[in-house]
Amino acid sequence: MQPGVLAACLLLSWTHCWSLPLLNSNEDDDLSEEDFQFAESYLRSYYHPLNPAGILKKNAAGSMVDRLREMQSFFGLEVTGKLDDNTLAIMKQPRCGVPDVGEYNVFPRTLKWSQTNLTYRIVNYTPDLTHSEVEKAFKKAFKVWSDVTPLNFTRIHNGTADIMISFGTKEHGDFYPFDGPSGLLAHAFPPGPNYGGDAHFDDDETWTSSSKGYNLFLVAAHEFGHSLGLDHSKDPGALMFPIYTYTGKSHFMLPDDDVQGIQSLYGPGDEDPNPKHPKTPDKCDPSLSLDAITSLRGETMIFKDRFFWRLHPQQVDAELFLTKSFWPELPNRIDAAYEHPARDLIFIFRGKKFWAPNGYDILEGYPQKLSELGFPREVKKISAAVHFEDTGKTLFFSGNQVWSYDDTNHTMDQDYPRLIEEEFPGIGGKVDAVYEKNGYIYFFNGPIQFEYSIWSKRIVRVMPTNSLLWC
């Protein structure tokens, strides 16, 4: 039996070893006994401690707290060793069934295929899609990996393939039972004989070729990464990140983290059709520029490319998320954002459209057009926006101009637009992002931010953009 399969079986055999509550919570979080049971089951499934021989380290409460700390670190959360609302929310997101630690990295050798010509076979189909749609999704998913490596994938219709693909429910014959709708979506085994390379999909899910339900192509591309020998990635922008996020209808490009991982196993291919693979931003990059900033219920949301950093007022370390993991309906990248606290809304802009999220939910009737706010046709996008609660005014920045909007009358103020350089001397002719706090406006222009005093109407400090993220 393949060592990875043996480790998986040993892992599962200890799944129900503990019954006592082994975790503590933050006092401010109202968590139920069911929440603790769910969290402990999650940690046993995805953060089960194995030694190199594949044997469980039974250390009861201490071990479980260690697993929780490891899980919090893996997902970029504040590492407390205590169960809290943010940690539980991550645990409850739909995800891959392969453990985040242990199974792939307990063996001293690298798990990879010795040959570059691999076969796959579709054993059965989901009733959610036509046979043609399923076949197209799997073919496209394999192409994600063959585009950047020397690997070739050929479908066979009979016999045993290197990668056997099947749909099943609950206990389906491999000691890794599925759990019904949501939760665990699919799993795959590392390269090798027997189960090695095989990918299984939970047929209690609703599989689609769109944003509804779970997109089969995206889940399959992730699982086939495991079939080729990849672990889960800590990079929230990576395809191999364990949590499912629908990333949009546009042309899929394999992120750089995944390219580096798969090429470390198999090397590069002859010709990459997408030589520029998206990278996850580094918050401490000295040349960091931002797309948008807004507050949201006391937190600060800092947008860059497909991502945003979520900065809690009591924490130094910002958490990084894909924008679509919070708001699947939004574009991958945004231009501007601001909060309207009195309405408990944020407004998010991209091109000539804007959306109004209330928490995770976007209000009905959105997106709307910029013209609804009174912008003329020649305004193609908003580059930054900031709302002032005491005056009911919102400033919009577009190109080298600034506009003032009256939220009470729902009209643009007269004598606007004005030139940014004349209205706020010294900050330059454009604004990438802006926010207001304690009587100061913070303007971001490339790698520089300007602290501007509303009272004295002058710049009082100039700082690097990345200092906002404690760099």
Swiss-Prot record:
Which compartments is it annotated to reside in? Secreted, Extracellular space, Extracellular matrix; Secreted
Biased composition regions of type Basic and acidic residues, renumbered to the chain: 273-284
Query: Which residues does the annotation say bind Zn(2+) 2?
Result: C96, H222, H226, H232, M240
Provide the residue span(s) of the region labelled Disordered. Answer: 263-284
Q: Where is the active site?
A: E223
What Enzyme Commission number(s) does the record list for this chain?
A: 3.4.24.-
Residue ranges annotated as propeptide in the record? 20-103
* Annotated InterPro entries: Hemopexin-like_dom (IPR000585), Hemopexin-like_dom_sf (IPR036375), Hemopexin-like_repeat (IPR018487), Hemopexin_CS (IPR018486), M10A_MMP (IPR033739), MetalloPept_cat_dom_sf (IPR024079), Pept_M10_metallopeptidase (IPR001818), Pept_M10A (IPR021190)
Free-text comment on the cofactor: Can bind about 5 Ca(2+) ions per subunit. Binds 2 Zn(2+) ions per subunit.
Where do the Hemopexin repeat units fall? 281-330, 331-377, 379-427, 428-471
Record-level Gene Ontology MF annotations = calcium ion binding; collagen binding; endopeptidase activity; metalloendopeptidase activity; zinc ion binding
- Sites binding Ca(2+) 3 sit at D179, G180, S182, L184, D202, E205
Show the SMART domains listed in the entry: HX (SM00120), ZnMc (SM00235)
Give the positions annotated as glycosylation sites.
N117, N152, N158, N409
What main location does UniProt list?
secreted
* List of residues binding Ca(2+) 1: D128, D203, E205
Annotated stretches, region: Interaction with collagen: 268-471
Q: Where does Ca(2+) 5 bind?
A: I293, A337, A385, V434
Q: Which UniProt keywords apply?
A: Calcium, Collagen degradation, Disulfide bond, Extracellular matrix, Glycoprotein, Hydrolase, Metal-binding, Metalloprotease, Phosphoprotein, Protease, Repeat, Secreted, Signal, Zinc, Zymogen
Amino-acid positions noted as binding Zn(2+) 1 in the UniProt annotation, renumbered to this chain: H172, D174, H187, H200
Listed Pfam families: Hemopexin (PF00045), Peptidase_M10 (PF00413), PG_binding_1 (PF01471)
* Signal peptide residues on this chain, from the entry's feature table: 1-19
What role does this protein play?
Plays a role in the degradation of extracellular matrix proteins including fibrillar collagen, fibronectin, TNC and ACAN. Cleaves triple helical collagens, including type I, type II and type III collagen, but has the highest activity with soluble type II collagen. Can also degrade collagen type IV, type XIV and type X. May also function by activating or degrading key regulatory proteins, such as TGFB1 and CCN2. Plays a role in wound healing, tissue remodeling, cartilage degradation, bone development, bone mineralization and ossification.
Q: Which family does it belong to?
A: Belongs to the peptidase M10A family.
Q: Mind telling me what this protein is named? A: Collagenase 3
Native source species: Oryctolagus cuniculus (Rabbit)
